[in-house]
A protein has these predicted regions:
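Conserved ATP-binding/catalytic motifs of P-loop helicase motor domains
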Residues: 1-224
């Protein structure tokens, strides 16, 4: 099924490799928590286009969120999915946070409660409503901190939506408490690792990019 949907979705003769096919199938499947890891250039965006179509064919929706509004906007444009910054989605679902000397303090409003930030009554999510079976895809998930991931998990539990953490845990660390992607990965019922780099025409450059990604394991990557 994934191969057929990919043929209908992708243009210019593009196809998915085995890892992309598995990842698209996992995101378009029924696992509530999915993790897809891989360095830049492994075709995560192309894979997400196909996953979105898989979900749509089932009457389900993909919502892409990212740590920054710009990253979310780019992901939305490239995949055709609804997109938002992760914090905008959390805010829409009632979460509020303030910085304190000991870290961020998170609270959650319930419908009918007054929002202390605006003085208005919070009426529930209005911009990013989620239904059972929808999939929230967290792009650049390696940058998500534990507090934020915990809030998203609560929303998924309440709404019945699934989560897909997509990104490279070795690329960039979050500003807050790190480890969210690793924790989500350990709890995921579907984990896919993308390893084929498509960004470079010369395979040697792709291999080098993978070595640079883990300099601790290959200290000669940069030198050679």
């Amino acid at each position: 099924v994934v191969t057929e949907v990919a043929a209908d979705t992708l243009t210019n003769g593009r196809t998915l490799d085995a890892g992309q096919t598995e990842a698209a199938g996992a995101i378009g499947g029924t696992d509530r928590l999915v993790t897809v890891t891989g360095p830049a250039g492994t075709g995560k965006t192309t894979m997400l286009r196909v996953a979105r179509r898989l979900l749509e064919n089932q009457g389900r929706r993909m919502v892409i969120v990212a740590p920054t509004k710009k990253a979310a906007s780019v992901a939305g444009q490239e995949t055709g999915a609804t997109a938002s910054s992760l914090h905008a989605l959390l805010h829409d679902h009632g979460f509020r946070w303030t910085d304190t000397p000991t870290g961020q303090l998170w609270t959650r409003l319930v419908p009918g409660q007054e929002d202390p930030q605006t003085g208005r009554i919070y009426e529930g999510p209005t911009r990013y409503e989620l239904d059972r079976g929808d999939r929230v895809v967290v792009d650049e998930a390696g940058m998500v901190d534990l507090h934020t991931a915990n809030a998203l998990a609560a929303i998924a539990l309440d709404s019945g939506a699934g989560i897909a953490m997509v990104g490279d845990h070795l690329q960039a660390l979050p500003v807050g408490h790190s480890g969210a992607m690793s924790l989500m990965r350990s709890r995921s019922s579907a984990v896919v690792e993308l390893s084929a780099v498509h960004r470079f025409k010369d395979p040697a450059w792709g291999a080098l990019s993978l070595r640079i990604r883990e300099p601790g394991r290959d200290a000669m990557a940069v030198a050679h």
